[in-house]
């Protein structure tokens, strides 16, 4: 596994944005959940990167309202103060999945008009996004609903099919989490990881 810094990742994404612009492509960034990535939300350099994407989506989200402190999307909006119109909403004000959400995500990933990238976190039990089980890993859905016995909320997550449609995926972790992970790497996530970026 190759480990690089988060600054390397910022420069990679900056170059991808330049390439996409020259190719007349729209850009979509899928973000991960968790606390480590929230450090990027407070960086002016990263805010510039986020604002350069046409759309921001979340690869995994708990089935909670945006006002809830456990909402990945809600925390992103609260910390970054980014233009909310850039962010693709998942749940309505009643906590129900927006009609057409899966269709919109599928359109981004399959359309030749968009270049789609993801910054993906992973769990110490071996999952990435919210793909907790082997059943999740073999489902052919682009967007799926799942739940882990270790977590209290249902999740909306991208499936492995979505992973295959991304133009690029970049795994990200704190140094502390990476050290724990390297001491006991778990499937299935290690099968997908050849490069990781860390703070």
Go through each PLM region and give its residues.
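ATP/nucleoside-binding phosphotransfer catalytic cores, i.e., glycine-rich phosphate-binding loops
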Residues: 165-199
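Short, conserved loop/helix-junction motifs that constitute active-site signature segments
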Residues: 47-55, 82, 137, 161-167, ...
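A glycine- and small-aliphatic-rich helix-loop capping segment at beta-alpha/alpha-beta transitions
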Residues: 43-51, 74, 133-141
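Class I SAM-dependent methyltransferase SAM-binding "motif I" and its flanking Rossmann-like core
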Residues: 120, 124-160
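N-terminal glycine-/serine-/threonine-rich phosphate-binding loop
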Residues: 1-29
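Ligand-binding beta-strand-loop-alpha-helix segment within the catalytic cores
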Residues: 10, 51-119
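Short acidic/glycine-rich loop or secondary-structure boundary segments that cap or lie
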Residues: 65-67, 97-98, 125-132, 137, ...
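Glycine-rich beta-strand-to-loop/alpha-helix junction loops that act as flexible
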Residues: 31-36, 120-124
């Amino acid at each position: 596994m190759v480990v690089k810094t988060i600054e390397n990742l910022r420069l990679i994404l900056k170059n991808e944005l330049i390439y996409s612009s020259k190719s007349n492509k729209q850009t979509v960034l899928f973000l991960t959940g968790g606390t480590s990535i929230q450090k990027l939300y407070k960086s002016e350099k990263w805010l510039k990167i986020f604002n350069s994407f046409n759309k921001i989506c979340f690869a995994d989200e708990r089935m909670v309202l945006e006002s809830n402190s456990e909402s990945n999307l809600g925390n992103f909006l609260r910390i970054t103060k980014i233009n909310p119109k850039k962010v693709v909403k998942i749940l309505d004000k009643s906590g129900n999945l927006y009609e057409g959400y899966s269709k919109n995500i599928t359109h981004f990933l399959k359309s030749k008009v968009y270049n789609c990238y993801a910054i993906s976190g992973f769990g110490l039990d071996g999952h990435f996004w919210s793909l907790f089980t082997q059943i999740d890993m073999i489902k052919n859905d682009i967007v799926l609903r799942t739940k882990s016995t270790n977590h209290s909320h249902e999740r909306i997550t991208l499936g492995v099919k979505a992973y295959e449609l991304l133009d690029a995926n970049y795994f990200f972790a704190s140094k502390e989490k990476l050290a724990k992970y390297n001491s006991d790497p778990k499937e299935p996530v290690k099968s997908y990881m050849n490069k990781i970026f860390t703070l």
